Amino acid sequence: TPFVIFYVLAYVQWALNYILIGRDSKKLCYQFVLGDILSKVICLFFFILFPTTLTRPEITGTDIFSQLVRFIYSVDAPVNLFPSIHCLESWCCIRAAYKMNFKTEKRTNYYRVATILMSLGIFASTLFIKQHVIADVFGGIAAFEIGMILAKILI
């Protein structure tokens, strides 16, 4: 099941996003960092005032994929789900990919397509392994968009 690969690579994508955007434009990097911070403050507001949880299915299989899902469940508690920070960060990468320009149009387009595919995989994997529901995905996107609007006003 490919969702495991997406989770490992997600952290690389999130970090790489800031490195690349910082190399492209300092002002844009500052906006994205501030937008990210502000969007997480929005998430914290929801986590404190409107805590959410999710009842996950019992994983009874003994195969490697079942063991991996049990491991993910053990390190990622089913609380503070709305908005999804996994999806927020992935959406941040998509938005950044459309703001950055690499040396060639081919590289720029390759990065954009790779980022979209990776991020959509992360969105799907959080749903398919029962870490989030669809509202959490859209909540993460909305939180980031609001954070970016505020960041553009402040910077």
Label the predicted regions.
Residues 71-155:
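Membrane-embedded catalytic cores of phosphoryl/pyrophosphoryl-handling enzymes
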Residues 1-80, 89-101, 111-115:
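Hydrophobic alpha-helical bundle signature of multipass membrane enzymes
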